[in-house]
Amino acid sequence: MLKGIHKYLLMCFGTVLFTVQANAARIMSNNPIKEDWQCKVVDGEWSCKRAKKPKSVFDKKLTKTEKEKALADDLAWVKKPSYFVGGYYSNDSQFTKALCESKKTDLSYEKSEFDNDGTLIASGNVQVLQCDQELYGNNAIINLNSNNSAIRSLVMAGDVIVKQPSTGIVIRTTELDADMNDGTYSTGEAYFRLAREMPKTRIYDKEHFSGYLRGYAKTFKKESSGDIVLSDGYITSGDPYDNAWKITGNNIDIDTNTHMAYVKNGYFEIQDIPVMYIPYFSHPIDDRRRSGFLYPGFVQNANSGIGISVPYYFNLAPNYDLMLQSVIWSQRGIMENGTFRYMTKYFQGQFEGSLVPYDFKEGKMRGSFTLSTTGQYENINTNFKYEYVSDQNYYNDFSAGNVNLVTKTLLDREFDLTYTNDYVDSGLTVLDYGVVNPLLTVDNTPYAKLPEVKLNLTSDGYTPDYLTLSAQTLNTFFYKTAGPANTNPGAPQGTNVNAFRAYESPKIAFNFNKTWGYLNPSLEVPIRYYQLKNSPTDTIQFANSSVTSVLPIFNIDAGAYFDKDYTNENGTYTSTLHPRLFYTYIPYQDQTNIPLFDTSLQNEQYMQMFQVNRFTGYDRINNANQLTYALEASTTNQEDGTTLASAKIGQMAYFADRKVNLCQGNSACPNPGLMDPFSTDTFSPIMTSFEFQVMKNIYLSAQVNYRVKQQNVDYQVYQLSYKDENENIFNVSYNNIANNWSSLTQQQIAEGAKPQPQETITLSTILNITDHWGIAALWNYNFQQKQIANIFAGLQYNAKSWAVRALWQKTAYTNQDPNNPTLLGPLVNTYMFEFELKGLGGIGNTSDISSRLQQINGYQVGEWGDGI
């Protein structure tokens, strides 16, 4: 037996150091189970006395409050009233950090003796410190290896605490039996905490969530595989003072290899009251994707009734997974949804499908699916997408108001293969469309490209910096099947002309660029050749079977930069003034003998003034003899590069009338001015674009076109946005477009219809009223149709360890008339409900409420806890 004060037994073998202290208790607060010294200065001198020994959480005589306090102390919970959760878990590593460098073991106690077999029996504030590991207890039996160079195993008893600062693991138990060689151990009755990685969003930050799972077990065992096995225990994510919910189980297994926790034969408890039996439950203990049930969902929709969804996530392999979701609809029956995702070295993609084996209302099987994949190998890229739906009402009946689906009239079917490098951009595209609603007329059905081949070349790198030679080649075969000739009921089948189009465009451009300005003239000569396959059933007839068009495009783009730096109390800034001229000349050519395959007219906006062609696609090239003059100004913060304000204003002066329009063949628009009432104006509208940081967190943007001759504003788009550090969001957007060219369908163009005005307003917000309560809302109103297009309101209650949210939505289904996609249909109500236990989020879960909130500008997935 070792006796005497300040006696040390020093055993130094290799890199392991044991320091044994006899009858000497350190004054150190790190050991949570020993009597600490409390010291204060009295009359200029230290006055110390022993503090009372902390109460044991296992003491059956403790009151509920005393037990919570004891547990908080044992798990190193530090109170911080300014935090919503009231504190945080401490993971102080100051006592083991140095041991990671020295690779030594620090062993201390008050009394000790050796058995004949060399076993060390220690008592009184036993403390074992190693790199990133702390063990404390009242008594310990320590077995050393054969040469006494390291600890082989130990048994600790009394008030035992085990800590691992790097992982945040803390175990409070009555006894510990540990094998130091293989890292296995077992305990008696134990309380514990485990760290849980969470998204960096408001309800999961350190002020609103502890970031840990904690629990209790009759026995706590770590096996040689690394798995942790608990018996007769529970888990929760509440702090030591929060017992809002628990998941209990006779057996709780934590697989450290798959990072999953499995609970068997347990209950879901609220305030210690069992409310639901759980025969089996699994959840991840980190952010990695793991198989298991995800949160069930609740939705109510007028078209399908009440739906309850139960999703299950399969983590099949590191590079592919599967999500299955069973939905029980009160009016439709069972619906099975599945999403399979995969990723290889060169490809990634997913399959999304839904199937209703038997629809109670329709009396038949219904479904839809989407298959998409992309690939990349060095400079080669591929893309494939195929969509299918069983009938025209499927999206309306089962999308629960999803605006991406209830507005869908076409199904994408596309394959792309491209090769690109610094000098070549080439590709092959095969594109076709499926029709959701068979009433879609043949004119309004887009052309298929069977196929389209492109080859673009540039001389960059081969010619001087001031010279660029390029060529653009695009060869396409356009094909369209027969469809309704018009919108009348029982309309006969009609066709559109099919054709081959060859587009070649060589270009020479000069680039005279300096730090203070630039002058970039260019000459381009698009050559178009069409081979038409006319048919008597074509809704638009063309006189010729072949058409050739050659048009030169001459352009000069010039500008200068004037910079000025200045400094104020807020920082250093650069103000830039950028005057710009853009001249374009294109001779006139009658192009009404060319069909419209992929062409429409753009709305006039500021950036459109710096394009040589106001038409999209390649079937129309406007005539032009025009000059754009513009002035741009901006202020930039030099420290972070953010733009505080930018303003742009410009106008085009026309030296010739715009004669090219969208008339084609024998369509009903023979008057060249019918499609564009401003084609003879000398000046374009004055076009402006503004972006301005009004003050911190408040941003204003606007685009306004003012026609001087008519003295009216015919294009105005405004957006006012606010978002602060607490993720409070408020947006107001207003659109008023006098002539909305982009809304015209191909049939309306063929009939010579004038573009209709568009006027809408959208208000949206997410407000975290308190740490508990948050609201989200959106309201979109169409002034022309005097109807709400979309509206929803959501409510979230956020507690320390759980959250609940609900949302009501009313959406106008716009796909009721596929030939008039801007026409709002009837409003349909949808209700959604979600419940979440913090820390038990199902990886891969897709939140229906989150998909609605993404319509709010500034919202990021996860701000309401969705998608965890």
From Swiss-Prot:
Protein encoded by which gene: lptD
PANTHER family xrefs: LPS-ASSEMBLY PROTEIN (PTHR30189), LPS-ASSEMBLY PROTEIN LPTD (PTHR30189:SF1)
Protein name: LPS-assembly protein LptD
Complex and partners: Component of the lipopolysaccharide transport and assembly complex. Interacts with LptE and LptA.
Top-level taxon: Bacteria
Similarity comment: Belongs to the LptD family.
InterPro entries: LipoPS_assembly_LptD, LptD, LptD_C, OstA-like_N
Entry's Gene Ontology cellular component terms: cell outer membrane; transporter complex
Signal peptide as annotated in the record: 1-24
Job description of the protein: Together with LptE, is involved in the assembly of lipopolysaccharide (LPS) at the surface of the outer membrane.
Keywords assigned: Cell outer membrane, Membrane, Signal
Disulfide feature: none
Keyword Membrane: yes
Source organism (scientific name): Francisella tularensis subsp. novicida (strain U112)
Subcellular location, record wording: Cell outer membrane
Keyword Lipid biosynthesis (UniProt): no
GO BP terms in the entry: Gram-negative-bacterium-type cell outer membrane assembly; lipopolysaccharide transport
